[in-house]
Amino acid sequence: MNKKILSLALMMGAFVSMSAQSTARKFVLQNSADGNSLLTCYLPQNPTGRAVVDCPGGGYAHLALDHEGHQWAEYFNKQGIAFFVLKYRMPQGDHNIPLSDAYQAMRTVRDSAAVWHINKEDVGIMGFSAGGHLASSVSTHAEYDARPNFSILFYPVISMNPDLGHAGSSYNFLGNEGVKDQKLVDEWSNDKAVRPHLTPRAILLMSNDDEVVPPVTNGVAYYSAMRNAGNECTMHVYPTAGHGWGFRDADHGFPYHEQMLDDLTAWLRSLPKPNPSAIRVACIGNSITDGFGIPMADVKGYPAQLQQKLGDGYEVKNYGVSARTMMNKGDIPYMKELAWRNAQAFLPNIVIIKLGTNDAKTHNWAQGAEEYRQSMQAMIDTLKALPSKPKIYLCSPIPAFKDSWTISDSVIVNAEMPIIQKLAKKNKCAYIDLHTSYIYKDMMLSDGIHPNAKGAEKMAGIIFDAIRKK
């Protein structure tokens, strides 16, 4: 924990007596320069390394800090989960105000992970109603260091369209003029911001009869976006109880309280426990890495199947983005993507690069072989400069069994592969010849470009063998 956080904790009487049976320490930190955003920290007696940052609701006008905040501390601490209640500032039309508070809270927890016995790769965010919108905004828009590893969303506001979400939240978050800006409304309607692999897994909990925040255009819309993106997501819809029940039990209006806790507990127990000492593997690529056409690509895409083969001693991340090129002058360059920034921030120990299929399109290859070579060299140079000093594997594209989208297998074989081989030798990178090794024409989608789930498993096996050879 840095000196600034420590001094703030001491100034504010940080070491507070135990507030509940499972809480070892409770203290409050200043979370904004003006002192109006606060982070109340509940550290458990028996930490597991997991943590949750909580964003109470209140329509971006006030905060329900009790039943959507502090009352949850014992529930989480009893499971060994550190719990942090965020008192965020109201936007009053400036959405950057609560967002900056939420980003700061996430960074504080990760910056202090060693002192607070937290695994910085196991930090989730939780939000209720408008706080659910804030939590889902962090999940979909934050950079790597502030993005949670999982999300817990209770009856969340997802749409910023006043007619589809919660009008008060929309006007308070975006302002009277902002709500008239369709581009801004779409940007912060978070079902439209879900990204494959980058948006963390989530659980959504809501009531079917919620008339304040309609489930279908909010929580259900987020679930649908997650499912369509191939991301892991769970949803529980309770028959009645409306909106805003939080931690209230049956005696206080929520008859499904115990069932809800059981559902949430089971989901939390199902989450993987990241190994802090795992070898970190970043899979960089296009739609073939992304898992285009493979339902639930986060489970059946080649990076996910590579994870299964490598086991718990490795942590494999999918940084594939569909349609992207290696060429910086291609139609959609990979190195302009958030996924590229995230792959670097991940500080990988191993990097698998498989880019070139889209470069082999007629209009892209018109940029020339030298552009392809220079762009790949630039990517290699950037990765070699990372403090983690990753081992880099350069892969040739798999065969283009058809010329869909003008992708030329001849360009791949006669132009790209020699460049990749020369760069591998020059930069002392490993080379994986997927083009020769991948002979599974019957394991392709009908476009002849993308492997199906069985083909992705074969790809994972080829790459696994190369990694194991070291």
Question: Where are these predicted regions, by residue range?
Answer:
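Catalytic nucleophile-loop/oxyanion-hole region of alpha/beta-hydrolase
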Residues: 64-66, 71-73, 84-120, 251-257
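Primarily recognizes the serine-hydrolase "nucleophile elbow" in alpha/beta-hydrolase
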Residues: 104-169, 185, 190
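Short beta-strand/loop motif that positions the catalytic acidic residue
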Residues: 203-210
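Conserved alpha/beta-hydrolase "acid-adjacent" motif
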Residues: 211-218
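C-terminal catalytic histidine-bearing segment of alpha/beta-hydrolase fold enzymes
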Residues: 220-275, 446-449, 453-457, 470
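Catalytic His-Asp segment of secreted/periplasmic serine-dependent ester chemistry enzymes
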Residues: 242-253, 294, 398-470
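Conserved SGNH/GDSL esterase-like catalytic core that processes O-acyl groups on lipids
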Residues: 278-282, 288-374, 411
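Active-site segments of SGNH/GDSL-like serine hydrolases
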Residues: 354-360, 381-414, 435
